[in-house]
Amino acid sequence: LIPYIYSRGFRGKIYCTAASRDLCELMLQDTAFIQAQDVRWYNKKMDRLRKPRIKPLYDTNHAQQVMKLFRTVEYAKPYRIDEEIEVQFTNSGHMLGSAVISLTIKENGNTKRIAYTGDVGRLHSHILSTPQAFPPCDYLICESTYGNRLHDDELVSEEQLLGVVEETCMYKKG
């Protein structure tokens, strides 16, 4: 929805890791294109039913223009947003570019530290970086969709992957 809020007038800075920016550049263009195709299909159907047409939430031009607002940051380096707010990104090890975002907010002589994290990766992964410790915080906002799940040992996961590759390549000739 970043291009959508841009299309509605947002012109603020968007802070993210370099990998997140690179992924966004591709994905936002792609979603704008897919959305345009879906809207064309939907509108043809609505025309036949003599019902109102719809417009895409945003287009490829919005997706391209919003990229000018992106500011990349390095992991583990504090960045001052303004006099009262500092932000730091810490590698969460979940996927390329993922981060725990820590805010330090000073207001009326008080300092509060707030951290937000989505998914957190596994320790000692062979594919992704190990999650790094983030600065202490007063408040933690944590996405926890799969928080009650235990993951298989990495060796078990590798054996499962090997089994799928073996079955696909050797037995199904894929």
What are these regions (language model features)?
Residues 1, 5-171:
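His/Asp/Glu-rich metal-coordinating catalytic cores
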